[in-house]
Amino acid sequence: MNKLGGIGRRLIQVGVDFLPAWLRRFLRRIQLGKAGQVPALPTTDPQKQLLVIGPVNYAGQGYVWGNAVAAASDLAAHSYAVEVPGGFSFAVDSEIPVAVYETSRAWQKQQLRFLSGADFVLLEAEVRLFGNLFQNFKQEVRALRAAGVNVAFLAHGTDIRVPSQHVKQTRWSIHAEPGADNFRAEWLSRRNIAAIRELTGPVFVSTPDLLVYTPEAIWCPVAIDLQRWRSDSPKPKRERPLVVHAPSRAAEKGTDIIEPLLFELERAGVIDYQRIQNVPSAKMPEVYQNADIVLDQFRAGSYGVTAVEAMAAGCVVVGHITPQVERAVEEATGVSLPIVSCEANQIGSVLRELISDQAGFSERIQAGQRFVKEVHSGEFSARALLQNWLRPQ
């Protein structure tokens, strides 16, 4: 793969959306190389209406949601995602090489024809569906709707999380850190929210904290394959509980705050601690099935796929949850969120208390597994999409 020099890399990192279109294309072509062979068109069931979900498949969610909808209805579903070098290799129906997505006009036009023949398209994270075929995703949505396609929106997180509002939700917000570069994030999130409101149509969010920024949205919970994460084997017996933390982006998870406190506990013989990095998604079930406690995130004030996977694997999950998220979950599901909520700087005392209560520890494990089965197995998510968009009552 060709590589940009330092100046080019920094330009892309600070936000290519601010650059002229011709310069964005030039830099990306240098970075990504030439487009390869155009992938073949997907094969779908012509007897069924088709739902297409794309183009990011964060944490494999597009794939899982599509399968859940297909299992719960008469619809066929297809997910696709842009293949990012160095990614986590999540399951997806179609993976598009990033160079093809960015530079292949043949693929872009082919994908436009494919999606124009679908009945429903769920656009993820306000990311363009066809590379640079159109100037922006608003033009894409209008083109699809002109072809008779029913388009809805699914926001995942930073795409609509407004920094100036997030700092009011939690004092641990990454956007409250000295030196935080919030300008682009503020601009991008507000632009995306304004665009989806201008376009109108159903809006879904994958985590309940995002309802703050789009109160009109419906929560479509992240979902997992329960069988993949659950294990019939008992946890290994050990003198000290194994605490793991698997930050995809350490700065955004509060790793820098909690780790010094975890190292103190480890030196005191209270816990064994492992930081999980660069582990393929296929290996993560084994990691969580071997762990006792999983530390999620301490800056967003919410929870996501990591917490759900860990609860399914029989771990107690600790993270920072805002009151708004706790209320939203209980209002939507009728049950309390079984994550131990903890301020980042209190992780030491919270873990000591948690470990000392063996009976309560076991109850939390069982509550977490029940919660995942009821809310995050895909059935709840499929109902959200079907009842509020695909098959409204």
Residues covered by each model-derived region:
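Aromatic "clamp/platform" in nucleotide-sugar-dependent glycosyltransferases that forms part
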Residues: 299
